[in-house]
Amino acid sequence: MTATPVYFDISCNGKPKGRVVFKLYDDVVPKTAANFRSLCTGDKGISPKSGKPLSYKDSIFHRVIKDFMCQGGDFTAPSDHLGTGGESIYGEKFEDENFKLNHNKPFLLSMANSGPNTNGSQFFITTVPTPHLDGKHVVFGEVIEGKSIVRQLERSEKGANDRPVEDWKIADCGELPANYEPVASGADDGTGDTYEEILTDNDTIDINNPQSVFAAVSKIKDIGTKLLKEGKLEKSYEKYTKANSYLNDYFPEGLSPEDLSTLHGLKLSCYLNAALVALKLKHGKDAIAAANNALEVEQIDDKSKTKALYRKGMGYILVKDEEQAQKILEEALELEPNDAAIQKGLQEAKHNIKLRRDKQKKAMAKFFS
């Protein structure tokens, strides 16, 4: 199958995330592939219709649904109407070329449309097989590099209309040489991590072998710990989050008591470490979420429970909900009455409550004076 390689350089809120490389099925759907290729290179210049560059550059992924797809390619509509625009290199719309290829696996490129023969520039990347789209949307390529970036996008926080809260942007795009060799799946990202973003995307992990899964999670967790010790907090949090996602996606049956104990221990360690790093990064909501996950682990011991409660309470201080922080830190103090860090956190929560109430009293007094 003839396949032109093209790429997106993806950023999230201005922070580079990496490169996603696609191969286009030129010989199966040449017209559709040529449209996407030109919108990557921008070689058609300015649209006489919209006055916008015929290019994906600086456009965002406006609709993302976990376990389904990531959609983008609308570079003509205003920000509050994304998903209603887009334009092909042939004019506004063009016909469905053919439906020879099916949506039978994740990481396929397919045309978004509003009905038969309404293809423009909008596209989507599948993240699971989507056979219900066969015969309705034209498959024209697939991801051959950067699958982990697609997975991060897929799992990003969403707001209204399934739009990512943060702007996942195509910061740059273009065409690669015909003989381009994609970076091998699971290539080291510079930290020693050679695993895909999602557990089931790995060819090197036997999902039916608990020891294989535990070894991968432990390796990712250890990389997170090393990065934490080096002061690389963002990268450390990224690795703990990745380890957590592996555990959240793992639903084994019939584990031995020993394997169950290992699973629970890994969950506790990863969740608690994620909460710790989130606090260091001043990410209160993330710290609370990670601590809550730790508290839900079966057979949690008192020492771990105390840590989780403390980190949850400090997370609430960061989000300025000191009343909730006080309640949780008091619960932690009951488990460990002599813990200086908990005592200090509780004092901070009470002090902040007093400051806010004093400020409110002054404001009310001024209002009625």
From Swiss-Prot:
Single GO biological process annotation from the record: protein folding
Main location: cytoplasm
Domain PPIase cyclophilin-type: 7-175
GO molecular function: cyclosporin A binding; peptidyl-prolyl cis-trans isomerase activity; ribosome binding; unfolded protein binding
E.C. numbers: 5.2.1.8
Matches recorded under InterPro entries: Cyclophilin-like_dom_sf (IPR029000), Cyclophilin-type_PPIase_CS (IPR020892), Cyclophilin-type_PPIase_dom (IPR002130), TPR-like_helical_dom_sf (IPR011990), TPR_rpt (IPR019734)
Catalytic reactions on record: [protein]-peptidylproline (omega=180) = [protein]-peptidylproline (omega=0)
A GO term from the CC aspect: intracellular membrane-bounded organelle
Annotated keywords: Cytoplasm, Isomerase, Repeat, Rotamase, TPR repeat
CDD domains, per database record: cyclophilin_ABH_like
Coiled-coil spans in chain: none
Protein's cellular compartments: Cytoplasm
TPR repeat boundaries on the chain: 217-250, 268-301, 306-339
Database matches in PANTHER family: PEPTIDYL-PROLYL CIS-TRANS ISOMERASE (PTHR11071), PEPTIDYL-PROLYL CIS-TRANS ISOMERASE D-RELATED (PTHR11071:SF561)
Family label: Belongs to the cyclophilin-type PPIase family. PPIase D subfamily.
Biological role: PPIases accelerate the folding of proteins. It catalyzes the cis-trans isomerization of proline imidic peptide bonds in oligopeptides.
Protein name per the record: Peptidyl-prolyl cis-trans isomerase D
